[in-house]
């Protein structure tokens, strides 16, 4: 089992540790609800060092990545990050990822932990077609910490006073020095709140983690586990690989049309996307249940005539709304907000309603 550089801290703090994609990761510390609410009201600190990260370098690096992904990377300037998707030729999703453009010949990529090896192999298989393109896997040498919440910038200013975080635009990043090491600070996140994600060499993870927690103590900062990370992203309707998106899902049927630029030229999976665009049959939608039963992945959705119309992608009890909420892959004709649906949970039909995503308003909305 793999461990992040912060694993000893998590263990000492009494975190509940689980196996997540081959990594021993904290799922909770004080409790999922308390941690969730801390991020929504104050700030939370996440160890997300299990995420994979690669460099793509060379004079044809941008051309290569344009071929491999759906978004238009030429629109990103140096110092900007871009949410993106890689597809198989049939339009199924290899992974969703963030690409950071350092300069015209240097790109940094963060991918999902469970897809790290698969993604790297997929990129390697196609890089041979582009002379001079070099791939470097830095996943084992780098740590990634996320600071998220409405008070995140107040805390960050105490630890990194040279960073003018509020002036750092959404999906922009910069590099700066901290205790003699270089940090990459990006205004990105997975919670819907103001915040940053910070990439650094492994040896700097613990000092920075402890400095941020100490600086944030007066503001109510908490360390946050994967459990609250999931409830936070689900309240926003953000995709999680293996749930809303996977190898059998086309991005045009998963609320990701905005990152598929069919007019940019050829990319892997473009032809499949063109076919789906002509007649998309389903998409991902949000729903809320009336009772207390929790929807789980794979539960079936039905209309009032008892016809199956979709399946649950993710579900939880929203700590903000105090209602069972979920996302589902749903036939398009049932996606109008207010539409009545029924979710089969343990053999009983639970009534619910389609609701727009995101479910909640945040410091970014």
From Swiss-Prot:
Stored SUPFAM superfamilies: Aminomethyltransferase beta-barrel domain (SSF101790), Folate-binding domain (SSF103025)
Enzyme class of the recorded protein, top EC level: transferase
UniProt keyword annotation of Transferase present: yes
The keyword Transferase is assigned to this record: yes
Gene3D superfamilies (UniProt xref): Aminomethyltransferase beta-barrel domains, Aminomethyltransferase fragment, Probable tRNA modification gtpase trme, domain 1
Entry EC number(s): 2.1.2.10
InterPro entries (alphabetical): GCS_T, GCS_T_bac, GCST_C, GCV_T_N, GcvT/YgfZ/DmdA, GcvT/YgfZ_C, TrmE/GcvT_dom1
A single BP term in Gene Ontology: glycine decarboxylation via glycine cleavage system
Cellular component, GO, one term: cytosol
Single GO molecular function: transaminase activity
Catalyzed reaction equations: N(6)-[(R)-S(8)-aminomethyldihydrolipoyl]-L-lysyl-[protein] + (6S)-5,6,7,8-tetrahydrofolate = N(6)-[(R)-dihydrolipoyl]-L-lysyl-[protein] + (6R)-5,10-methylene-5,6,7,8-tetrahydrofolate + NH4(+)
Keyword list, A-Z: Aminotransferase, Transferase
Entries under HAMAP family matching the protein: GcvT
Subunit note: The glycine cleavage system is composed of four proteins: P, T, L and H.
Family: Belongs to the GcvT family.
Function: The glycine cleavage system catalyzes the degradation of glycine.
Protein name: Aminomethyltransferase
Species lineage: Bacteria, Pseudomonadati, Chlorobiota, Chlorobiia, Chlorobiales
